[in-house]
């Protein structure tokens, strides 16, 4: 996170987006697991 701390102030509004980015693949994985479970149980 040291790189993000060195960004200019102009990028400050984008900090929440950068914080959320690592969570998106996990959400897709969970969505895939739930979809597979619903299809297999049906």
From Swiss-Prot:
Known partners and oligomeric status: PSII is composed of 1 copy each of membrane proteins PsbA, PsbB, PsbC, PsbD, PsbE, PsbF, PsbH, PsbI, PsbJ, PsbK, PsbL, PsbM, PsbT, PsbX, PsbY, PsbZ, Psb30/Ycf12, at least 3 peripheral proteins of the oxygen-evolving complex and a large number of cofactors. It forms dimeric complexes.
A GO BP entry: photosynthesis
GO cellular component, as recorded: chloroplast thylakoid membrane; photosystem II reaction center
Alphabetized PANTHER family for the sequence: PHOTOSYSTEM II REACTION CENTER PROTEIN K, PTHR35325
Chief location bin: plastid
Function field: One of the components of the core complex of photosystem II (PSII). PSII is a light-driven water:plastoquinone oxidoreductase that uses light energy to abstract electrons from H(2)O, generating O(2) and a proton gradient subsequently used for ATP formation. It consists of a core antenna complex that captures photons, and an electron transfer chain that converts photonic excitation into a charge separation.
Pfam families: PsbK
Recorded family membership: Belongs to the PsbK family.
Domain of life: Eukaryota
Propeptide intervals in chain numbering: 1-5
Record's keyword annotation contains Metal-binding: no
Keywords from the UniProt entry: Chloroplast, Membrane, Photosynthesis, Photosystem II, Plastid, Reaction center, Thylakoid, Transmembrane, Transmembrane helix
Topology relative to the membrane: Single-pass membrane protein
The UniProt record lists the keyword Endoplasmic reticulum: no
Source species taxonomy: Eukaryota, Viridiplantae, Chlorophyta, core chlorophytes, Trebouxiophyceae
Name of the gene this protein is made from: psbK
Residue ranges crossing the lipid bilayer per the database entry: 17-37
Subcellular localization: Plastid, Chloroplast thylakoid membrane
Protein name: Photosystem II reaction center protein K
């Amino acid at each position: 996170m040291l790189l993000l701390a060195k960004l200019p102030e102009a990028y400050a509004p984008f900090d929440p987006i950068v914080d959320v980015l690592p969570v998106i693949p996990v959400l897709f994985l969970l969505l895939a697991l739930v979809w597979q479970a619903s299809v297999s149980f049906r």
